[in-house]
Structures are given as structure tokens and as C-alpha cells.
Amino acid sequence: LGIDSSQIVNQLTGASNKAAKQATSIFSGMGKKIAAGLSIAAFTKFTKDCLEVGSNVTEVQNVVDTAFKDLSGQADQWASNAMTNFGLSKLSAKKYMGVFGQMSNAMGITGQAALDMAEDVTGLTGDVASFYNRGTDEVYTKLKSIWTGETETLKDLGVVMTQTNLDQYALNNGFGKTTAKMTEQEKVMLRYQYVTSALSNATGDFVKTQDSWANQTRILSLRFEQLKASLGK
């Protein structure tokens, strides 16, 4: 497109960290550069994408507010740092946290415990995606198995969560009983600890490999997504 990529990255970085009003003024300058290299159809699609992302922000926020209630502010603050810590856009982080939180609520896990669990598994989603070079949505879907108990999806991540393995882990880690004698809530907590332990090698991978080409490309894409979210509000 004949656009200075370093200049675009700097503009995207600024836009993703400012309020919607400031993002609009930034877009007025950057948008001219983008528009100069895009067809009318492509620019129309960009505008449509902004509106769709903006709509998703509202829907995701509603789920977060419902799942965490008066703790939703903590969730928002955590998600604001998810890009640099885990390679997740704020929107994706809140989406994952909201769903994980709702699933925990359904199992009787609420309040701070539900939020802590959602943050841990959402962060793990970003790290595992970086470790295995997979899409974050794919990893997010697989990690739902912590709540659902599905085992096949986790094998792609090197986690073999058989009944035998879970029972042995429970006896070795202070649960004092096997899954046959556990409540559904206890089973969720067991799977949570088992999976996070099994994926411990991936923990912190995004930060460790942040300068890699794959992760730098991911960050650029995430900044562009956040710009769309700001413009679409």
C-alpha cells in the first residue's frame, strides 16, 4: 500500500490505549492513509468490521458484568493488560473470561474464586496459543474442557486427562478422594488444577517469546483489532 509500517504500528498503539473520542481523531489522519491504498469496497468492509467489533464489545461486557457483578471492574483492568502479558486483545480476554465465569457460576463457583479462575485460564489460553503456535480461539475452546470434562480436545495440547490420571492426581494432591466420590464442583476444581499443572511448561511463554516474528505479528493484529473496537463504539 506504500504505507510506512512503523508509523502505522505507532498510530495503532496510541489508538488502542486511548478513549473512543481520541481514537476518532487519530483515525481521521490514519484513515486517509489507509483509504489511499484501499478500494472503496475494502474500505467499506473495514468500516463494517469496526461496527461489528463495537457491537461485540457491548455484548461481551454484558456477559462479564453478569458473571462477575461488582468484580467486573477488576476483570476489565486485568483484560486491559492481556495484550502485553498474554497476547490477547482486551475484547478476546473479556470474552473468554466472561464465558469461563458463567460456566463456573453454573457449577456453584462465584465471586472472587470465579474471577481468579477465569483470569488464570484466560492467561493460560494466550500462553498455550503462543507455545503451540495455535489460534487463541482454538485453545480457548479446548480449555473449556476444564468445566465440561471432555478429554479428547486436550490431547492436542499434550494433556491426557483420563479418569485414572485424574484420580491419581487427586490422591497425590490433597483432595483425599477419587472422582467417584466428588461433587461436580469438586471435579471442576480437580480438572482445573490438573490441566494447569499439565500445561505448566507453557506458562509465561508469550512474554518469553514476545520478540518472535509470530508474536510480533500477533501483537500488530491485536492493536488493529482494538482500534476497530474503539472506532466501532
Predicted regions and their residues:
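Preference for small-residue-rich
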Residues: 1-57, 225-233
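Intrinsically disordered, low-complexity regions
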Residues: 5-9, 23, 151, 192, ...
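Small-residue helix-packing and pore-constriction motifs in hydrophobic alpha-helices
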Residues: 35-87, 98-109, 116-129, 138-212, ...
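Secreted/periplasmic proteins that engage bacterial cell-wall peptidoglycan
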Residues: 91
